[in-house]
Amino acid sequence: NKPLQVSVPDPSALTVLASKSHINPETKKYIEKYSISNSKNAGSSLKFCLIAAGEADLYPRLGRTMEWDTAAGQAILLGAGGHVTNLSTKEPLYYGKPGFENPFFIAHSDKGIIKN
C-alpha cells in the first residue's frame, strides 16, 4: 500500500467532483470558471477521498452541510496534502461553529487552482 497523496493538477484539464443529489445552479456556475476535462459524481466523504488519492482535483460544495458530514473526509484530504477552503473567506474550513453548519467550501488538491 502506498500513502495517499493529492495529484499535481493541470489547470487546463481538471477533474471536478459533484454531489449526486445536490448539484444546484450556484455549483454549476462556479464549475464553469474552470477548464474541466472530467466530471465525476460521488457521494458524501468519498469526494474528499478521491482528491486525497489523486483521482480528482476539485470539489465545490455550495450547499448545506454539517460538520459531521465533512470532518472525516477533510482529515483524510489534509493528511494527503489537500485543502478545504471556506468559499467566502478563503480561509481553511474550521470546526466547532455554533449550530455546526458549514459555510460553502471548496475541497481541492492545490491552492493555485482556486478561482474567486
Q: For each predicted feature, which ranges?
A:
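Acidic beta-strand-loop-alpha-helix segment within the catalytic core
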Residues: N1-F48, K97-N116
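Hydrophobic residues within well-ordered alpha-helices
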Residues: V16, L50-A52, A71-L78
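Short secondary-structure boundary segments
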Residues: K20, G63-T65, L87-K90
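A generic structural signal for short
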Residues: I36, R61-L62
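Alpha-to-beta junction loops
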Residues: A53-L58, G81-H83
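Acidic donor-binding loop at a coil-to-helix junction in glycosyltransferase catalytic cores
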Residues: W68
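Acidic, metal-binding active-site segment of PIN/NYN-like and related structure-specific nucleases
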Residues: G82-P98
